[in-house]
Amino acid sequence: MIDDTTVRENLTVSQVAFFAAQLTVDSDALAFLEEPWSPKHIAHQRLYDNPIFGNTCEADLERYRARGFARLVGRQNYAAFSRWSRIDCVKEPEALTELSISYLSWVWLWKQRDGKRCADLALKDFVRASTAFIGWPDRLTERYVVFQRNLEHMTRSTR
């Protein structure tokens, strides 16, 4: 899947290293497909009760829980991804737990957050680049280690 994306998006080695590092960390090494917390915990913590998520009723908190490698949350994000992908995840939210659609959610996030620009910045200022891409400084050391490892491996592989 990543190979197809790198060709289609014409990504450089450092951009692929950044893309893969962010994906690896955010998806817990491709293991995360759905928020593990119970509906009761989600409701109690009011995790997705923010108006920015576009949820219109209490049931939406559970229905549009974090899913996919991009951890899409809320009716609004599900709708935006659905428009882009032409897969109706608003009607069928569980579709985001399918590997190919989950990966596609990551590609969508990459495009939404201008991943190429962030990846180019990563060589100069990884913290700023990663924070800009994810939206906050989360697990930066882990992201940096994976990025450097990817970069080393890919640079060695292309010689």
Residue ranges: model-predicted function:
Residues M1-D4:
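N-terminal export signals and maturation junctions of secreted/periplasmic proteins
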Residues A132-R159:
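Low-complexity, Gly/Ser/Thr/Pro-rich intrinsically disordered linker/tail segments
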Residues T6-N10, P93, G115-D120:
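Short helix-to-loop capping/linker segments positioned immediately adjacent to catalytic or ligand/cofactor-binding
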Residues E9-A17, R63, L96-I101, K124, ...:
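Soluble non-cytosolic domains of exported or imported proteins
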Residues A17-W110:
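Peptidoglycan-targeting cell-wall enzymes and recognition modules
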